[in-house]
Amino acid sequence: MALQLTDEWDKVFPKSDKVDHKKVTFKNHFGIELAADLYEPKDASGKLPAIAVSGPYGAVKEQSSGFYAQEMAERGFVTIAFDPSFTGESGGEPRYVTSWDINVEDYQAAVDFLSNQENVDPEKISIIGICGWAGVALETATIDTRIKATICSTMYNIPRIRTNGYFDSENSVEKRREKRIAVNNQRTEDFKNGEMKLQGGIPKILPEGVELPKFQKDYWDYYQTPRGYHKRSSNSNDGWAASGSTSLMNCRAFAFANEIQNAVMIVHGEKAHSRYMSEDAFAEMTGHKYETNNAPAPYTGNAPVGETREGNKELLIVEGASHCDLYDQKDIIPFDKIEAFIKENI
């Protein structure tokens, strides 16, 4: 069935007059047709470097990934922001499920597409992942040698969260078994009911009289206000399928991250609750040993603010930034450093 693509500009960010934009589609190796926004710098000539962008987890290309893609197109790159399989305007049934394997393939399919564009230099392709898709991007970098530079912004390691909970607070055999029982009971109910239950997105209204962690308030401020709300975003609406991430509970991310030879930059906010996931991924990838450990809960704060380099790998901790600041805050996202890192390594 043909994808239904909107013709209107329905992004949560203004349209740039410095780039050309159009909708494109392409298929991954699982036969799922993906929808993407293609951004090209105006009046450019010759073969250009290119970037594929996706994320955050539960978002659509009209949100943060499109914001990044348009910004990088203004800087001279051909870019696409794509909806992963089963989400947004992309194909795939059932809806609102995730698969580590299929989502890595989504990135590879985006590289396939870019490699075959007349105005793209296939030897100068990079990828950017945001939030949960930063983790997918890093995993893709382990398998796809065509990717010359990978940018992981405000990373979530989704399999780790699904398996061990936040800050590994559920990292026990007993806790994992409880979650497995719950998700498999939900599968039974889904089959009986003929549809997959959705677990709910970010609450529409913040509860009164309840002191929520700052990161939950930040998610609400992005997904449920005009700043970032989008009608096709699962986070802005009814969320992921409750049993749709079963396979993530049986997956260990970044098993071969130490074998990545091409360049990787991991960017994270100093104040982000999720910071430990980027710090740990950088250590797994490079073997880096942190000199400090002032982590309160129990991880955040191992790496110094600023740049940590190991060859062509970099961890950049952005001073004062939260997790969601790196979704769309142009004065906080280090676009100049991202651009310089990519151009240095392609």
Which residues make up each language-model segment?
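Catalytic active-site module of serine/aspartate enzymes centered on a nucleophile-bearing elbow/loop
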Residues: E319-C324, D328-I346
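N-terminal cap/lid segment of alpha/beta-hydrolase-fold proteins
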Residues: L3-G46, Y327
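Alpha/beta-hydrolase-fold enzymes
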Residues: L138-T225
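Catalytic nucleophile-loop/oxyanion-hole region of alpha/beta-hydrolase
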Residues: K61, T87-P122, D328-P334
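Conserved alpha/beta-hydrolase
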Residues: E71-G91
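The serine-hydrolase catalytic nucleophile loop
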Residues: G58-Q70, P84
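Short beta-strand/loop motif that positions the catalytic acidic residue
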Residues: I260, I266-H268
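Short beta-strand element of the alpha/beta-hydrolase
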Residues: K47-P56
